[in-house]
Amino acid sequence: MIKLIATDMDGTLLNAGHEITTMNQEAIKFAQANGITVVIATGRAFYEAQTPVAETDLKVPYICLNGAEVRDESFNIMSTSHLNHDLVHKITTALKNNHIYYQIYTNRGIYTEDPKRDLAIYIDIAERAGQKADVDKIRNNIQKRIDNGTLKVVDNYDSIEDIPGELIMKVLAFDADLSKIDQVGQALASSPNLAVSSSSRGNLEITHSNAQKGIALSAIAHQLGIDLTDVIDRKSV
């Protein structure tokens, strides 16, 4: 009997306007009404994941940043996993040497060196998911995140680790050259302390090896006393 469902967000729970569809809201509520716990499991940071949920009356736990951060329904942090200096250096050196653009995700925000490039990337993500990208809405959302401080524009990423309390949780890399980015991803994945995944063709999501959705989902199931045979990890609800 299914007791726990994990659902992704981009290209599944969300539409092209980055909103939770009415159909998916109703599906989540139906599952919850029948005693099933629904968890959002996403590569997004919490402040990105919670924004579309806040526009609804849903209450759900979150697995964020591919498992680097887990929060309960009341937003309390249950667990975190970050990248130390040596791992960050290993990742960024590989990306820079191959001229691959990337963003840095921390416990406090997302760092970018080029918001215009971010716009093109988010449009590409939507289109690769088979959606028609709402360019104006995506552009406005980027500006809104810059204004509220969750997207931080910097000249370079070198000083992030020097900020007190700032922990690097994930590196998100993009490149249109699929062969190149696949090669770099395979090289980084050979490190026993790194987990490398991809949410769409042309990107890499790099976290600590302890930060994986499957690990986080297993931990939530254990906490709730749910056997893994009663868990579904789905791309949509």
Go through each PLM region and give its residues.
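Conserved functional loop/turn residues at catalytic and ligand-binding sites
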Residues: 8, 13, 35, 195, ...
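Short alpha-helical
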Residues: 19, 47-48, 179, 212
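Active-site phosphate-binding/coordination module
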Residues: 22-132
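Conserved small/polar residues in nucleotide/adenosyl-binding loops
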Residues: 237
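Non-catalytic pre-domain segments flanking phosphatase-related domains
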Residues: 1-7, 222, 226
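Hydrophobic "anchor" residues on beta-strands that sit immediately upstream
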Residues: 4, 61, 232
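Conserved acidic, metal-coordinating active-site core of Asp-based
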Residues: 108-232
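Asp-based phosphoryl-transfer active-site loop
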Residues: 3-17, 91
